[in-house]
């Protein structure tokens, strides 16, 4: 039977670990009720807290501990029912935690990535740090459905519909969906890259999907099948230490391509000095850098987002300039195009383009999409169309609108 003397661990370490698990439970309540229950159970259990706190600090991450528990065989039952399994299986849980890492590889993050890649022309050599299994190195291979106000657009790969279908609500986008990038070279960097052709790595990748997220699991499995058909180069190493060599390899492999470095939700795992070193390298090395991170992970990006009026906890930036807000998994994207129009202004213009002029169904459609009476809708639209920003955005449409209004 596994026993532990609680007096061997400082109270501060127990409290630190308990607080970490409580914060996780609070933040992730909507994503996984089971993990919330387990996290709170551990946070209030002195014996399990002592066991968790014996792990190296980086291995105490709640999602890592809970995933290892599942893989070790703890059944998906309430914490009260499963507690004895946690205790009995702890040696296996700890062994897994010491050899594995949280390598969440969610293809849905390709939706904001595509928004940024749309601004880069020509062939692309894509390098991703924190690539895990490389599922987000293939944004050109997936089907996308973009839902905007009053319209929906589906974009297919060149060879037809993909088995991976990603859906995102997008605001502030223009008339056409983001273009598909021409990716001619791919490389991922990760401390412990996963090979989806190996059953053990594939099992771990799937285990990182939380219990209730069956739709997400389907996406990960389908994306892994695509990656397995043409595995990218995945280099084991630290992001800051390996990025220079990866860029050099990309320049040699694709000399005519634009090198794009992507860091989707990974810089938060580096300390502040390493983040700054990485950002400085990207700024000085003649590469394009796409960042998708929490608002304050790179403080100057967060400050720039404040100045631009970009809201939200996650910010998409290109070369250090914020271009959109997004949720952490790319399910909602609000684009700020720099035209002087707000995202909602752009959506108004594009809605009118799609539903030009008075029609029999216009009034009901306006109420459904904008929750406005038709008169109020046109008042708002007139105000937008008369602005210099709208004339810069689409002078032909603005002129046509003005001519129609005079009739």
Annotated model-derived regions:
Residues 1-54:
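Non-catalytic accessory regions outside enzyme or core folds
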Residues 37-123, 135-143:
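Class I SAM-dependent methyltransferase Rossmann-like catalytic core
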Residues 55, 75, 100, 104, ...:
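Class I S-adenosyl-L-methionine-dependent methyltransferase module
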Residues 259-272:
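A short SAM/SAH-binding and catalytic strip from SAM-dependent methyltransferases
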Residues 269-318:
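C-terminal substrate-binding/active-site "lid" region of AdoMet-derived donor-dependent transferases
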Residues 350-390:
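Amphipathic, hydrophobic secondary-structure cores in small proteins
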Residues 389-403:
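Short Lys/Arg-enriched helix C-cap and helix-to-coil transition segments
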């Amino acid at each position: 039977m596994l026993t532990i003397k609680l007096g061997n661990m400082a109270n501060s370490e127990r409290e630190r670990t308990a607080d970490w698990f409580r914060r996780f439970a609070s933040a992730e309540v909507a994503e996984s009720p089971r993990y919330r229950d387990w996290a709170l159970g551990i946070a209030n259990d002195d014996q399990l807290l002592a066991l968790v706190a014996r792990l190296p600090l980086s291995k105490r991450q709640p999602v890592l501990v809970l995933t290892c528990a599942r893989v070790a065989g703890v059944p998906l039952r309430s914490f009260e029912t499963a507690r004895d399994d946690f205790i009995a299986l702890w040696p296996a849980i700890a062994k897994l935690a010491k050899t594995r890492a949280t390598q969440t590889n969610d293809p849905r993050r390709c939706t904001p990535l595509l928004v940024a890649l749309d601004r880069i022309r020509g062939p692309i050599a894509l390098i991703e740090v924190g690539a895990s299994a490389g599922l987000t190195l293939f944004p050109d291979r997936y089907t996308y459905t973009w839902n905007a106000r009053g319209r929906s657009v589906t974009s297919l790969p060149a060879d037809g519909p993909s088995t991976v279908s990603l859906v995102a609500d997008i605001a502030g986008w223009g008339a056409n969906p983001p273009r598909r990038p021409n990716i001619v070279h791919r490389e991922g960097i990760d401390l412990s890259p996963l090979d989806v052709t190996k059953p053990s790595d594939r099992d771990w990748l799937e285990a990182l999907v939380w219990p209730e997220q069956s739709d997400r699991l389907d996406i990960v499995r389908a994306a892994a099948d695509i990656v397995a058909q043409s595995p990218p180069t995945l280099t084991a190493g630290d992001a800051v230490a390996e990025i220079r060599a990866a860029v050099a390899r990309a320049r040699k492999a694709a000399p005519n391509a634009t090198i794009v470095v992507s860091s989707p939700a990974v810089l938060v795992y580096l300390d502040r000095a390493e983040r700054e070193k990485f950002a400085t390298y990207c700024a000085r090395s003649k590469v394009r850098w796409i960042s998708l991170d929490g608002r304050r992970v790179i403080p100057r990006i967060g400050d720039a987002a404040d100045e631009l009026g970009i809201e939200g906890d996650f910010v998409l930036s290109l070369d250090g300039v914020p271009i959109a807000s997004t949720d952490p998994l790319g399910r909602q994207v609000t684009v700020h195009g720099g035209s002087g129009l707000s995202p909602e202004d752009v959506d108004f213009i594009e809605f009118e383009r799609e539903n030009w002029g008075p029609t029999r169904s216009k009034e009901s459609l306006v109420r459904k999409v904008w929750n406005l009476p038709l008169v109020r809708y046109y008042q708002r639209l007139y105000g937008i169309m008369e602005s210099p920003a709208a004339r810069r955005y689409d002078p032909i449409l603005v002129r046509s609108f003005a001519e129609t209004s005079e009739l």
